[in-house]
Amino acid sequence: MKQVNGQKLLDALGNGVSAIRGRITPDAPMDRVTWFRAGGLAELMFQPHDTDDLVAFLKLVPEEVPVMVIGVGSNLLVRDGGIPGVVIRLSAKGFGDLEIVGENRIKAGAICPDKNIAAMALDHGIGGFYFYYGIPGSIGGALRMNAGANGGETRERVVEVHAVDRRGNRHVLSNADMGYSYRHTAAAKDLIFTHAIFEGFPEDKAKIRHDMDAVRQHRETVQPIREKTGGSTFKNPEGNSAWKLIDEAGGRGMMIGGAQMSPLHCNFMINTGQASGYELEYLGETVRAQVLEHSGIKLEWEIKRIGKFMPGYEIKEFLGRADG
């Protein structure tokens, strides 16, 4: 049963939407736009034409209406009850720009794939971006979660970030303003990142290519990159590895319905066929509960879970076996 009413929300925005150039879709299926290929409907999905269009749209949306943004849909688990309010899905046309803007500096739009900035850096002999070649997703997500891999992190390269807040006001944030820590930024949660400036350093192209090849080979060997997955499921606890804790607790290959902890890399959760959002999240909480029981460590989700549970299908953290 449908849990959202997008047309009602669209009507409430009034005549101002006629000036909006982007695409507005009521009751948009989220399973078509996320890497897990699971979950319910977005009450209203908006794909802005560009930053000006995004600003104009946000000024129309009442403050009490929830707004969230997605990029390419990686690292995202949508619950089956759908997402109330507005989901903003940035488009490659308006937010996928990628260009050199100064010596060793690259400007990247929020929807630009992470691997593309690595490739551009290689083409221009700019070091420090090799690690992006192994990160699924887009620059906006990397900025929001301080994405990193293979010894590199986003915070090491960011110079400034351009963003729009919930009310449609524009902001420019410095690296310090972003307040980066492990897989986290202190930047306001309502900020929608539109693009950013990154800085690397001169480096021999052969060295960059070697590092990128090593990242690619490692990823292809140990990660289920051809499966329907959101990437790393849980953050690594300090001084430990999530996959190792899961493996020791018996979680490798565990299945619930169509959801499975990958036998190849057990910190990757995969949709083996037609898994629901409920099955994926229930599997994740089952694994958290097992790790807690086995090692006493509370794994934290790295994948972002959004939306509402279907009535009668609510899931408690650690399946209620601990104070989450």
Curated annotation (Swiss-Prot):
Q: Where is the active site?
A: R183, S232 (proton donor), E302
Q: What is its main location?
A: cytoplasm
Q: What is its EC number?
A: 1.3.1.98
Give the subcellular location: Cytoplasm
Per the record, the GO terms for biological process are: cell division; cell wall organization; peptidoglycan biosynthetic process; regulation of cell shape
* Database matches in InterPro entries: FAD-bd_PCMH, FAD-bd_PCMH-like_sf, FAD-bd_PCMH_sub1, FAD-bd_PCMH_sub2, MurB, MurB_C, MurB_C_sf, Oxid_FAD_bind_N
Q: Where is the FAD-binding PCMH-type domain?
A: 36-203
The pathway noted for it is: Cell wall biogenesis; peptidoglycan biosynthesis
Q: What class of enzyme is it?
A: oxidoreductase
Q: Which reaction equations make up its catalytic activity?
A: UDP-N-acetyl-alpha-D-muramate + NADP(+) = UDP-N-acetyl-3-O-(1-carboxyvinyl)-alpha-D-glucosamine + NADPH + H(+)
Recorded GO MF terms: FAD binding; UDP-N-acetylmuramate dehydrogenase activity
Keyword annotations for this protein, in alphabetical order, are: Cell cycle, Cell division, Cell shape, Cell wall biogenesis/degradation, Cytoplasm, FAD, Flavoprotein, NADP, Oxidoreductase, Peptidoglycan synthesis
Per the record, GO CC terms? Answer: cytosol
The coenzyme or cofactor needed here is: FAD
Q: Which HAMAP family match?
A: MurB (MF_00037)
| Role noted for this protein | Cell wall formation.
Q: Which family does it belong to?
A: Belongs to the MurB family.
Q: What's the name of the protein?
A: UDP-N-acetylenolpyruvoylglucosamine reductase
Q: What is the species of this protein?
A: Sinorhizobium fredii (strain NBRC 101917 / NGR234)
